[in-house]
Design a protein with these regions (language model features):
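Hydrophobic alpha-helical bundle cores within soluble ligand-binding/oligomerization subdomains
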Residues: 1-185
């Protein structure tokens, strides 16, 4: 059983007609089953793990939604506290990575900087592809993504970077690193 429109199998269409489908940009290609996300754009429906996005936007914070997407359930109070603690302590990037930011030209797009910097994380965590480190690497990536994104933006506008601080929430820290300046802090 499928949610949304009834699917047409491209393989069945090929078998019946001998014609293959061409879908530039996969604009009409759908994954028929997903335990993570359901989207019906025509009806304005977006669900994560069965929860309507409106409910999550009103009642859950970003770290809880990230936890839901990764682990399949909203965290208990204890799980949430532990998750937030891990995201906080892993939010700093290696100091040597700061040199990489200086190598980008002043007009480099922040997304180009961000993607290059995320790729460079594997150089600092050589065991990133080992199964026993999966949870730790998930935490590191989520925790450091906000720091790298903020530093990328600061680089693109020529402002000094702001380090993360442990007393702020994930989103408050991100906004602070994006828009604060050392002279005003």
């Amino acid at each position: 059983s499928f949610l949304g429109a009834d699917p047409l199998s491209a393989a069945a269409l090929r078998d019946m007609s001998g014609v293959v489908t061409y879908d530039p940009g996969f604009g009409s290609t759908a994954v028929c089953k997903s335990a993570i996300t359901f989207i019906d754009g025509d009806k304005g429906i977006l669900r994560y793990r069965g929860y309507p996005i409106e409910e999550l936007a009103l009642r859950a914070k970003f770290p809880a939604v990230a936890y839901l997407l990764i682990y399949g359930h909203l965290p208990s109070a204890r799980e949430y506290a532990d998750w937030r603690r891990k995201l906080t302590i892993h939010s700093y990037i290696h100091e040597d990575m700061l040199k990489f930011f200086e190598g980008f030209p002043p007009l480099a797009h922040p997304m180009a900087i961000l993607s290059a910097m995320v790729a460079s994380l594997s150089a600092y965590y050589p065991n990133f592809d080992e199964h026993e480190d999966v949870d730790l690497n998930i935490v590191r990536l989520i925790a450091q993504a906000k720091t790298i994104a903020a530093y990328s933006y600061k680089k693109s506008i020529g402002e000094p970077r702001i380090y993360p601080r442990t007393e702020f929430s994930y989103c408050a820290n991100f906004l602070r690193m994006m828009f604060a300046t050392p002279a005003v802090e």
